[in-house]
Structure formats: structure tokens, C-alpha cells
């Protein structure tokens, strides 16, 4: 794990994160649908995209490989986001609670983070709903860059708590 971390440090030093913009979507449900809606909107507006999530790795809506995880390893995320430097406008990804908790978003820059919803799930891994919610919150407190935009569902369980954490970082905020 330390070697893995050192490799990522070296990669980031030699080649900073490449996409012009990066969007990460988290939530109990709706991550895949939301990322695909975004990718389709981008396609029809001639925005070059890369997408990773439950359905695999995609460049401009064409599948390039399968993925066994919703959020691949941080090395896989980093390499895919930085591949093909030309036409690298937007990187869209699904941010799972496991991936966030395990630091798979370390070394990635996220410009826009969104949470679709939050309900009891993955308690076999997280043990408590609070721990599960805290892992989702990492997208906004640790991963989203300081000039980033947070998009929050106003009907979210723990909405006020999420809102207070986001406001404490002075992030731009959009609610729906």
C-alpha cells in the first residue's frame, strides 16, 4: 500500500491531473443514471468525455473496458482520466462509499461533486448509517477542490449536517 501511494505521488508530480473538469457523483441510488445523463448531454454538445462507473470505462460514450468495481483503484482512475491528453474535456465518475472510504479518489481533482440520495446500504462494510454517511461526505470535505461546486439533494437524510460541512468549506452550493 505504501508503494502504491509512492507510485501515485510520482505520477502526480510528473503528470498533474489532466482533464479540464472533473465531476464525481455519489449517493445510494442514481449514480449510474446521473453519470450517463451527463455523458449524453456532453455528447450532444460536442464535449469530449471519459466516464467510469458500474458499467465500465467509456470514452465519448464508447466502452473501452469493463470494471469490477463502481469506483476502480486510485491508480486506475488516475491513469484513465489522464489517458489521451487531446480531447480530454470532462472526466465523469461514480464515487462509491467504499471507494471514498478507501481513498481511491486521492490524487484526483474533482471540480463538481454531487450526491443524489442517502439511505441505509452497505452496512456490512460501514457498520452504521453514520459511518456510511461520513464516507459519502468525504467527497465534499476531502476530495472536492476548494473552488469546487457541491450539488446536494435537499431531501437528503442528514441534509442539514451535509450542508453545514459544505458551508464550512465556503464551496459553491447548488441544491435541488
Annotated model-derived regions:
Residues 98-106:
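Conserved helix/coil segment N-terminal to the catalytic DExD/H
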Residues 64-72, 121-126:
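Flexible beta-alpha connector loops of hexameric P-loop NTPases
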Amino acid at each position: 500500500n505504501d508503494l502504491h501511494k509512492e507510485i501515485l505521488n510520482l505520477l502526480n508530480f510528473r503528470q498533474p491531473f489532466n482533464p479540464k473538469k472533473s465531476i464525481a457523483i455519489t449517493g445510494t441510488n442514481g449514480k449510474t443514471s446521473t453519470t450517463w445523463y451527463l455523458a449524453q448531454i456532453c455528447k450532444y454538445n460536442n464535449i469530449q468525455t471519459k466516464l467510469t462507473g458500474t458499467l465500465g470505462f467509456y470514452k465519448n460514450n464508447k466502452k473501452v473496458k469493463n470494471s469490477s468495481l463502481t469506483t476502480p483503484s486510485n491508480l486506475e482512475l488516475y491513469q484513465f482520466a489522464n489517458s489521451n491528453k487531446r480531447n480530454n474535456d470532462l472526466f465523469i465518475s461514480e464515487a462509491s462509499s467504499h471507494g471514498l472510504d478507501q481513498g481511491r479518489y486521492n490524487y484526483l481533482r474533482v471540480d463538481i461533486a454531487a450526491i443524489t440520495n442517502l439511505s441505509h446500504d452497505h452496512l456490512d462494510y460501514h457498520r452504521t448509517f453514520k459511518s456510511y454517511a461520513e464516507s459519502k461526505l468525504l467527497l465534499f470535505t476531502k476530495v472536492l477542490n476548494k473552488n469546487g461546486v457541491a450539488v446536494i439533494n435537499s431531501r437528503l437524510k442528514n441534509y442539514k449536517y451535509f450542508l453545514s460541512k459544505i458551508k464550512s468549506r465556503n464551496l459553491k452550493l447548488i441544491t435541488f
